[in-house]
Amino acid sequence: DNNVEFWRQFVAQYFAPNARKRWCVASYSRSGRQPAGVFPQDIWPCDLCGASPGRGFEMTMEVLPRLFKIKYDSGVLEEVLYADLPAEYMLPGGAVVLEYDHAIQESLFEQLRVVRKGKLKIVFNSDLKITLWEFCTQNHEELVPRRLVLQQVSRLADLAFKFQNHLPGSLTPNQLHSHCATFATMCRELTHKLDAPTVNDLGFTKCYVRCLQISEVVNSMKDLVNYSREHNIGPI
């Protein structure tokens, strides 16, 4: 069941109270790809890609349940993570770190598959709960299932074949107009198929990015909220 209570229990079971989840996208700008209007404002040194400062989205444990819910509400059917063997080491405080040089994360929609390639770092505390989950995305691809466009492509091929087999000048103006109208309709149908569902230049849905942006604002105000609570001081 995709409800907030389920995701709260999930996060409490697998994430530590001070857990953070980071999504670094600094490699997009370095590769020359400039996402339009969606580039995040959070910055930090990224150990995975070496960007200093790196750029991306940072989420705290408090907002993760809502983010998970919105992700699946916005059309994601399934997420799959593939990774090679990790480099494992332990920090002085007892935390266990797993670093994957090659990781692939796939988001499966009904009519689209978004494949992200990058590096992954996961830090577990002594209770084996996640304190840091960091994915550094190098690029992503948007793949459309073959079954989705096969019918339109086949019809376009048939129309082109029929048109080529007519002798030059043998088509009447009405026949030519009919062929052009059919071709335009098929192209519009194919374009509509390729445009749905809508993801932005980072491969995220609009609703999910909006929630990420709200979480950025909440994170930036967290110290102020804690200070107000500790000193019993209101906003006015």
Outline where the language-model segments fall.
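Terminal "cap-and-tail" regions of soluble proteins that handle hydrophobic small molecules
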Residues: 1-236
